[in-house]
Amino acid sequence: MLQRGLSYGEGPFVIWEDIDMRTVCKPGHPVPYSLHDMRVSDITLSDGQLTLQFETGLVRIAEPCVQVDGRVVLTGVESCEVWRLSPNGEYGSFSGKKQTWEKFSRKHPEFSFEVTDELYGFNQVRYEGYLSLPDREKLTEFCMAVYYTGDLIYETEE
């Protein structure tokens, strides 16, 4: 049985050390806003800066959890790739496509993307959800993976 001893940590992790010489790391939420269920209306990538615009803003994680107008900016972007997978997230076999953001956006200048999951790691972020294209009735499971060496910035109206 784990007996918690010393607890410490800043930022996205809280770490406990116990008397059995084990270290348990519990990831925390590293960001102040949630993008869950938010619809991305525009994405631009220029000069190493990726900007995501949202139809209805972002949700502040701290109480009170309110929705605020804002956008997400990543600086120092070195790569941005997207995966298009199964229609409506169906199980079973599927065919997909992996592309750079530049190639995808040239072919699909009009789209919307509803974020259902956000994953954050060292110099990387991944947004997953459903892509809507004007010429397709069904939503498509979609993933955007970004590797960056700069900052993750939330520009909000508050």
Model segments located where?
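Targeting/processing segments of secretory and organellar proteins
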Residues: 2-5, 11-13
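Surface-exposed, interaction-prone regions used to assemble/regulate multi-protein complexes
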Residues: 13-158
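Small/flexible residues
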Residues: 5-6, 128
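Generic early N-terminus positional signal peaking at residue ~5-7
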Residues: 6-7, 26
